[in-house]
Amino acid sequence: SDKKQEGNHMADYSKMKPEEVRELIRKGEITIPTAGMCGGYAQANLVILPKTYADDFREFARKNPKPCPILEIMEGSPEVHDMGEGANLVTDIPKYFIYKNGVKVDEVTDASAYWEDDFVGFLIGCSFSFEEALLKEGIDVRHISMGCNVPMYKSNIQCQPAGVFEGPTVVSMRPMTPENAKKAYEITERYPNVHGCPVHMGDPAEIGIKDIAKPDYGDPVEIREGEIPVFWACGVTPQAAVENAKPPIVITHAPGHMFITD
């Protein structure tokens, strides 16, 4: 199973170079969430959409830099330039979601068949990028220690709308002691390109989350006695906006399954 595969190899993947892991992903040998892989390298969320929607989406990202920090834009070709040498947007992510008219219609490990020449791809910063820094400070990152995907929730924090795109900010959650939460705030503040500091700490209901045990994306994680949930803006936010805007086709990463940059 995925979980077992994860436990066996996660330690090996954490020390590997991004191009090595991307090659294993391209060959279909890694199909699990990428948290904890290639420690110290930024990871990215993906949104690919038809050119006619690209300007609205670029504007949506510009107006919402916390959940949607753009790292690179690829027009007309899935080949990546700055973020990963020799990398390809449609083969180098472990799992993709395909949306048609706002509805998820497919999950694939290779999205080449869906690519069209008038598509534009956006790589957006991901909070997995700063987890290495948290681990170095001795902060337990629960989804890594549990070997599962990070829990993600649609919040009641609304994004600034742009063109056809609007929707809630999706947040990722990591439980920790209040003392570690303060440390995590100070650490992640230094990473504005990958969501920066938390958007909320404590009571999930305050940001519209009814049941912390039922994430909208990813897996639930254990919150231990004396811990509080800490929430960061999350790059799955565009997927919620896509569900509202309903473009004819959109390719995204599957939540938790990231593009690992150089």
Where are these regions (language model features)?
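Residue-identity detector for glutamine
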Residues: K4-Q5, Q43, Q158-Q160, Q239
